[in-house]
Amino acid sequence: MIIMGLDPGIAACGYGIIHAKGTKLECLACGVLRTYSDESATKRLESIYQGVSNLISEFSPNTVAVESLFFAKNSKTAMKVGQAKGVLMLAAAHNNLEIFEYTPLQVKQGVCGYGSASKEQVQKMVKQILSLDKIPKPDDAADALAVSLCHSQAYRLRTRL
């Protein structure tokens, strides 16, 4: 199964694509889709949509996992991230992909085994689980891989029951 994990953001939207076959996990790609503040909001959202659509075409994921928006001190920022998340979900829906959402707590539990894990602990586990040479950069890419791993774990548990 190929899982595309997404960490929504308007300036940097992280993606992490893994291949999960049984207990074997392999990182196929990770990175960020960047937009720039001098672009209009519409152009930025279109860029995110196109970028995710291109990744879907290239990697043909079976499913998409998205990190849920938890909270933001700035409501304007929360709104922009929510718009980016909507565009990501639309791209997945246009490709008939099932979408799963995970909270940051669920991602930490799925990757590290406990919900109070630090960002650094999650990144180290992503590196270890996927047998990577180094922690993926930027953080948004590592976060997206963590979302993919969380879904892989949740899927394995669901299919065993």
UniProtKB/Swiss-Prot annotation:
Binding-site residues, Mg(2+) 1: D7, D140
Subcellular location: Cytoplasm
The protein's required cofactors: Mg(2+)
Keyword flag Transmembrane: no
Coiled-coil ranges per UniProt: none
Keywords: Cytoplasm, DNA damage, DNA recombination, DNA repair, DNA-binding, Endonuclease, Hydrolase, Magnesium, Metal-binding, Nuclease
Signal peptide (UniProt feature, chain positions): none
Family according to the record: Belongs to the RuvC family.
Protein name: Crossover junction endodeoxyribonuclease RuvC
Name of the gene this protein is made from: ruvC
